[in-house]
Structure formats: C-alpha cells, structure tokens
Amino acid sequence: MNINVADLLNGNYILLLFVVLALGLCLGKLRLGSVQLGNSIGVLVVSLLLGQQHFSINTDALNLGFMLFIFCVGVEAGPNFFSIFFRDGKNYLMLALVMVGSALLIALGLGKLFGWDIGLTAGMLAGSMTSTPVLVGAGDTLRHSGIASTQLSSALDNLSLGYALTYLIGLVSLIVGARYLPKLQHQDLQTSAQQIARERGLDTDANRKVYLPVIRAYRVGPELVAWTDGKNLRELGIYRQTGCYIERIRRNGILANPDGDAVLQMGDEIALVGYPDAHARLDPSLRNGKEVFDRDLLDMRIVTEEIVVKNHNAVGRRLAQLKLTDHGCFLNRVIRSQIEMPIDDNVVLNKGDVLQVSGDARRVKTIADRIGFISIHSQVTDLLAFCAFFIIGLMIGMITFQFSNFSFGIGNAAGLLFAGIMLGFLRANHPTFGYIPQGALNMVKEFGLMVFMAGVGLSAGSGISNGLGAVGGQMLIAGLVVSLVPVVICFLFGAYVLRMNRALLFGAMMGARTCAPAMEIISDTARSNIPALGYAGTYAIANVLLTLAGTLIVIIWPGLG
C-alpha cells in the first residue's frame, strides 16, 4: 500500500496542523550556543518551509489561535494591570511607554525609508521586539482595515515574513545586550543590587532555598526558666530571638495553645515551630531540657497555602505591616505576575499578589481571611466565565468609530485583550469567580499561539524565497536597530530622568521587552533576584502596550504618505 504523504496532509487540515506543531516544537528545542530557538520560532520555520510546498490550512484555525492567545494574555495581566497603571507604577508605566513608543516610531521611520509595505514593517517590529502580541494586533487590524483582498493577502504574507526574518535577530541581540550593556555603565549591577538591598532590607540571594517549617518539642529546664526571668511570651519575643514560635504547651498533662500572657514553668513541654536552620541555631538555654517525642504535642497540621492579596487592609501596605510571624505563620514566597519577588519587608502589596505562607492550618486560615483568600487548589476551569468574557471581548471588537470619512474599529485583538484583563482582575478579587488553573491557562495560551504561528507561516511560505532576496539585508539592519536602540533610549531615560536604581532599571527594561531569557542574564549579572522587582513592574503593562502597538502601526501607516 502506497501512501502519498503530500495528498494526505493536503486533504486533512487537522492532521497537517498537528504535524506542523509537532515538528516545530521539536525544532524549537534546538540551541544555537546558549540560545534556544523556542517553540514559536520553531513552529514558524517549519510552517514557512511547508508553506513553500503549497500546504495550507483553513484560516478559521489561525483566527481561533490568535483569539485564544490574546485573551489569555489579558487574563494573566489582569490581576496587576490596574494597580500598576493607577498607583505606584508610574516609573514602570513610563519606561514601558518609552520602550514600546520608541520602537514603534523607529519601525515606522525605517519602513518608510526602505519603501516597505505595512505588512513587512509591522512584522519587522514584532520580530525585532520578539513580541507575538504585536504580530497578533497588527494582523487583526489589517483584516478589519477594509483594504482590497489582494493587498490584504500580500500584507499578511509580508507580516509573517518580516516576523520570521527578524525574530532571532531581536532575541539574540537583546540577550547579547543584556550581557554587555550593564558593563558599559559606571556602576555594576551587583553593587546596585546590594545598595538597594541595604536601603530596603531585601534578601539578595537569587538562589534562596525555601524550606517548610518543622515541629520539635522540648522540656523546659532550669536555664530556660532563669532566662525568661518571669516574663510572659509576649515580653520575651521568642520569634524575634530564635526564629521559632511556641505553638503548644503541655503542663501537668494538660495540652494548651498559649497566648501572649503565658509564662513558662519548670517541667513544661513546649512545641516549637520553625525552619530547620532556626532549630539548629537555638540557644542552649532553650534546648537544655530533654527533647521529647510526645505524639499529641507534635500532632499539628502544618500546611502551605497560596494566599491571594485582596482585602483593602492589606492592599497598599508593606509586608512588614502584616506581622505574619506574630500570628505564627512563615512567609516562603511573594509572587507577582508569575515572577518570584525578593522577600522584602518594604515591598508594597498589590491586589492579586500571591503570598506562599506556611504554618498551622488554623493560623494560616486566619491570616488568609484577614488579607484575602486562599487560592483554589482545583483543576476545574470556570468555563462559563471564560466563554462569557470571550464573547464580551468579541462584541467589544465589533465597535467601530466614525470620524468624517475615516472609520476606526477596535478589533478583536483589543477587545479580547480588554475582556481578558477584566476577567483576570475580577478573579483576583473574587475567589470563586472565573477560576482558571495556571497550567490550563498556560496550555491554552501556548496552544493558541502555536496554531496562530502555524497558520501565518503556511500562508506566507510561498513568498519567503523572494522576500529573503529582496529585503534580507535591510531586515538585518532594521531588526538590530529596532531591537537595541529603544533599549538604549529606555536606559538613558530611566537612569538620568527617572534616576532609578540600576538593578531595578535593567529588570524593568527586560520586562518592557517581555523577554524572560534576557531577564535571567540580568539576574545572573547582578547575582541577585532584585531585578525581578523591576521586571514584574513593567511586564504586565508592556504586554498590553505591545498589542496596542500592533494595532497603532496599522492605523498610523496610511497617514504617513
């Protein structure tokens, strides 16, 4: 039996799509030196090559892919978007605007200089910024621009061609820039990180290990009684001195949870809860009595929960003001926009921040009720909310504004992005509404992006050979300029206008470019995770601005003549 693979793929769009995805994902795992190609560029390259052989898929799959992707981008940005936009993120907002705005203007200028069409120009901007949201926003706006079908087809083909030719240029140049640009300034990042660590009391260890608290029990001996000198637990401040707190006391056979007025007596058996290193550092006076193994005394349910910050008495306050240790709880992690932040008493909490807290189950529940809610540990997605807001986004995208002879439509990209932001924001405020497990969100977002990349590659593949010969050299120059010049402008603006700490500034610059590999290099250079503060500050707003940039470049282009 002979099977014609070409006929088989041409006759089955679904099979072709998944063949492209599988081959592209395999290619994306390859590395060029220390740089991994990545899933998007792998799928795009494979789809372009197959597109040259005249394979194609239904455009409905491409449209659904980009819609799912951009909606999920909005959902991820939602919890922190408004807090960054309206409150303490002025510097981060300005940096993101400078980065995206300067890249947009430079791309427009180069496009006109080289005589490209809007498709090549927008694709070059998306690739140089390594930003799929730009590609998605531009593609959607082109489809709703009302231009002739032949021009539209050419523009869409050139859009994906420009992206494919400049993506690796943008990625590699930014990674190289992240490695060497910090060395060109007068203050190295490690010094900057240490400086802000001293000012704010930050934990600078980028590789900080997180341990769960453990319980050990001791019998109170004469040295501990002498050390307490009749003071109650509140006056002693056991946690401040030892890193452990007393969770239970057994006295005369009676087990009790002590309050701050309790005074230790000879023969008491106490259960101490703390991290392993805190137990190891205990003063001998606390351990001079015999360690005991009392099952009832040690029988506590220590849990680790992720608490989402929501309540007004926590939002806008500093971590130190929560006084978690006074309530017998231990803070393990602070996560903002999926970025782990340094453990810093002076970090101001935003709505939607996630605190990973360990302690007795009862105490953790009390803390969660005070500052927000415990994140749902469920694998069930609220599909009703997902679908409802998706529909709302599509309806918003249908809105068109008419100005004399000029009409402007919001478009599906902007509509779905806004609807996704609202769903993410409401989810951060209402624990039972719109829940989407992070794994499910990542999967839908990544799948939508890969389907979109496969579609644009297959549709543009037939013209890639001609495109390479005509604009290959120009694309190389333009890609480098659009990738690096906005970074330099952003650095000068942040360093000399905003006067930001360099470690925070470089993190914020990488966040404005939404480039995680470059962020890792900045953290390695600083030998600290402090740049993550800046990265998280600009990341959410930059994703939104980049999508809008893709829309704006298409709208502005006709007016430039």
Curated annotation (Swiss-Prot):
Membrane topology note: Multi-pass membrane protein
Where in or outside the cell?
Cell membrane
**Which regions span the lipid bilayer?**
8-28, 32-52, 66-86, 94-114, 158-178, 383-403, 406-426, 447-467, 475-495, 540-560
Indicate the segments forming the RCK C-terminal domain, all copies.
Answer: 200-288, 292-373
Q: Which GO terms describe its cellular component?
A: plasma membrane
What InterPro entries does the database record attribute to this sequence?
AAE_transporter (IPR050144), RCK_C (IPR006037), RCK_C_sf (IPR036721), Transp_YbjL_put (IPR023017), YidE_YbjL (IPR006512)
For molecular function, the Gene Ontology terms on record are: monoatomic cation transmembrane transporter activity
Q: Which GO terms describe its biological process?
A: potassium ion transport
Q: Which Pfam families match?
A: Asp-Al_Ex, TrkA_C
What keywords are annotated for this sequence in UniProt? Cell membrane, Membrane, Repeat, Transmembrane, Transmembrane helix, Transport
Q: Which family does it belong to?
A: Belongs to the AAE transporter (TC 2.A.81) family. YbjL subfamily.
- Protein name according to UniProt: Putative transport protein YbjL
Q: What is the lineage of its organism?
A: Bacteria, Pseudomonadati, Pseudomonadota, Gammaproteobacteria, Enterobacterales
